[in-house]
Structures are given as structure tokens and as C-alpha cells.
């Protein structure tokens, strides 16, 4: 998820669109009316133009999670970019991961904090290692010659949005192509956007403590569909939506998941006083009936360890069953304990 998260990034957002639409992306979020049945009504939405003109602390996060495959196997790439304003101080941070199905986790330059010299919040500031072109509504490019990679994302389609009094949270997905080394890898991006005001200035330092057992899975089906869910027991980000939510895009049909139930069947050991989720059984309901997902982490990297908790990314495989069809899945898991 964007936040203590990672994964791919991008954007030059239009501020007027942000302040006048439920979400930030073109088109209405699918099944928004039925999705609203599962949450309390919100008063809003947040006026982003007015917020930017004010002096309140502001936090903005863009998260792109890419999954693709070519004849050499699967590749996963994710970047999360966070910007904040606290008084006269403007910051920028990037979290980046890259994984090859056969080579494992690949070192990528450009992770960490960097200077936000232009005091940019809506647009992702260029860093020494990454440049950003375009916008999410019309297509965006993330280019890093130093790392030998270039991610091109088609215009984003909104799948779910949660406008609030002090926040905007949107989810989208789109086709994407990653050029890495001598490979051209076609796949999908699942995108998360957060704009929140009055966030604690301690968030960036202690972001993991804002979550309780957060699990976010960003999956691509073998036939090019999307599946996303997140679950958390914490209440710190309740305004951004239910603690359990998700969507699927199968056969070109986009739906918000209803009656979503997530069960962790197995946990693995961590270096500390906690355990990582390792295998899941997930069930839900959509227009064509019930669906199930079985998934497991097959490779994992610990990004941060707080001893009482931590932050990790994992590669996930498994099967998704819906409407009489069983689809293999491959993707990324973001885990915060």
C-alpha cells in the first residue's frame, strides 16, 4: 500500500480533478454504490486545492506494483513514493523493489529519502535515479537509465475510491510494460494513491507502528487479470476505507469484492517478537457468485525490522477460482507487522 509501502511510482496529477471528483482517476469507481454499504457514510470530499493553499501538514503517496512475464519468466517491480509538508519542510522518500523469478531479489539504486527542492506534493519529484513523465490519467513513464529499467503505464482505470473529510484514497489498474536490461516484459500495474492532511510528522519514522498485521496482495492472473486485497487490524487509517477490502478485474469485468474473508493459514518465523503471514485462504462474492483464492509466499525480503514488528515484501503464487475457472496467480505481497 502506499505508506510504509513500496512499489512503483508516477504522476503529474491535475489538482482541479482531485478536488472535484470522488477519486483521482478517470471514470467512476466500479460498484461504488454497493461498496458503500459496507462502510459508514463520509462527509466531504476533501478540497485538495484549499488544503494545498493552507498550512496544515500534508502527506501524499503514490504506489505502483508491476507484475509481468516474458519467455524468461515473471518479473515484479514496485515503487512507493511519499511526499510530505510539515510547516516549511518538504520531504520525499522512495521505496523500491525488483524481483526476477529465477534470479531472486535484484538490487536497485534510488531507494531512500532525497531532496524535494521544488516543494512538490501532487507531482512526484524527480530524483537522481528516477525521472517521471506524464500523468496517471493519460499514461505515465518511470525511467531509470542508471538501473537499466523503464516502466510505461497505460492510462489508469479507477477500480475503487474512498473520499474522506481529510483524505483521498484511490485504487486503479492498467496495462504496463517494463523494459529491463535486454527484456521487454508486458504485464499489469495496480496503483494506490493517498492524499491525507494532518498526518503526524512522526509517520515516516514510525510508519510501521500505525499498522497492525497489515497484508496487501497485488496479483496478476495468468490470463492478464487483476486481483487485490488488503487487510489490517489497525484503526489509524480507517478513514481510507474498510480494514478489509479488495477488487478483481477478470475477463475485462471490474468488481469490488463483497463479503471478503481473509484467513492466514500459516506464519513464518521472523527475527523478533512476531511472525510473518505465509499462506492465505481468501473468499468473497461478486456478481457471478463466490470466489476463492489460495496463495503462499515463495520468496521474501525484510525491508525493516523493529524487533516488535517489521516491514517485508514477498513474491506470492497460488490459484484463484471464480465463475467455474481456475486461474494461476503471481504477484507481490506487502507485509507490515
Stretch-by-stretch model annotation:
Residues 14-337:
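Structured soluble/peripheral alpha/beta segments that form catalytic or ligand/cofactor-binding pockets
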Residues 2-14:
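Hydrophobic membrane-insertion alpha-helices, especially the h-region
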Amino acid at each position: 500500500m502506499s505508506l510504509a509501502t513500496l512499489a512503483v511510482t508516477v504522476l503529474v496529477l491535475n489538482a482541479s480533478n482531485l478536488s472535484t471528483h470522488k477519486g483521482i482517476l478517470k471514470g467512476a469507481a466500479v460498484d461504488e454504490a454497493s461498496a458503500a454499504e459496507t462502510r459508514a457514510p463520509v462527509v466531504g470530499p476533501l478540497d485538495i486545492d484549499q488544503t494545498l493553499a493552507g498550512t496544515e501538514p500534508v502527506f501524499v503517496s503514490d504506489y505502483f506494483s508491476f507484475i509481468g512475464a516474458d519467455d524468461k519468466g515473471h518479473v515484479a517491480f514496485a515503487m512507493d513514493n511519499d511526499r510530505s509538508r510539515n510547516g516549511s519542510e518538504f520531504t520525499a522518500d522512495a521505496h523500491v523493489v525488483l524481483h526476477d523469478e529465477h534470479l531472486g531479489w535484484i538490487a536497485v539504486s534510488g531507494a531512500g529519502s532525497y531532496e524535494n527542492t521544488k516543494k512538490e506534493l501532487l507531482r512526484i519529484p524527480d530524483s537522481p535515479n528516477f525521472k517521471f513523465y506524464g500523468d496517471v490519467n493519460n499514461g505515465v513513464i518511470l525511467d531509470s537509465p542508471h538501473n537499466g529499467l523503464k516502466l510505461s503505464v497505460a492510462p489508469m482505470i479507477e477500480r475503487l475510491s474512498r473520499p474522506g473529510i481529510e483524505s483521498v484514497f484511490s485504487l486503479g489498474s492498467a496495462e504496463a510494460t517494463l523494459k529491463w536490461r535486454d527484456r521487454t516484459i508486458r504485464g499489469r500495474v495496480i496503483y494506490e494513491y493517498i492524499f491525507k492532511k494532518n498526518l503526524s510528522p512522526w509517520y515516516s519514522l514510525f510508519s510501521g507502528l500505525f499498522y497492525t498485521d497489515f497484508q496487501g496482495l497485488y496479483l496478476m492472473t495468468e490470463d492478464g487479470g487483476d486481483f487485490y486485497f488488503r487487510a489490517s487490524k489497525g484503526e489509524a487509517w480507517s478513514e481510507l476505507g474498510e480494514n478489509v477490502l479488495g477488487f478483481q478485474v477478470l475477463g475485462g469485468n471490474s468488481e469490488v469484492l463483497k463479503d471478503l474473508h481473509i484467513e492466514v493459514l500459516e506464519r513464518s518465523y521472523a527475527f523478533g517478537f512476531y511472525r510473518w503471514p505465509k499462506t492465505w485462504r481468501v473468499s468473497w462474492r461478486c456478481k457471478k457468485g463466490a470466489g476463492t483464492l489460495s496463495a503462499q509466499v515463495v520468496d521474501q525480503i525484510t525491508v525493516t525490522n523493529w524487533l516488535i514488528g517489521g516491514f517485508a515484501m514477498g513474491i506470492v503464487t497460488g490459484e484463484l477460482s471464480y465463475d467455474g475457472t481456475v486461474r494461476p496467480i503471481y504477484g507481490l505481497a506487502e507485509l507490515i507487522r
